[in-house]
Structures are given as structure tokens and as C-alpha cells.
């Protein structure tokens, strides 16, 4: 099963994850530098793993899939072994 959520990345390279019913622009006060969507899947070891992608229309910001996914994995303690 895959779950899709939204996120922003702050200038301090911290990720804020929230549900699809909220707008990225609801977090404008946190001065985001990137924004997008995240899904959770299962890696080859059978552990949950995030994947970031896409663009925020409400903030007019793109994601950086590679960087944002690494930030998410670190902050959510889901680094691959």
C-alpha cells in the first residue's frame, strides 16, 4: 500500500510533512525553499521508504527529488542499510 502526503523543506533543510487536504501555502510562514509530494513504499529489505517528487502549485515551488528524499529518510529515520 502506498501513502501520498505533501511536504515542504525549510531553509534549515528540515522537512515538514502534512496531509493532502492542506495546502503547501498553509506553511508559507515557515519560509520554505522547496515543496512537493511524498509517497511511502517498501525497499528491497522490506522496510518503509519515502520518495519525494513534484511541485507545489500554491507556492510555485519545485521539489528536488534526490535531495528531498535524502532529507526525508534522515529525518524520518528510514535510511537504507
Label for each model-derived stretch:
Residues 1-81:
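Intrinsic low-complexity, intrinsically disordered or marginally ordered coil/linker segments
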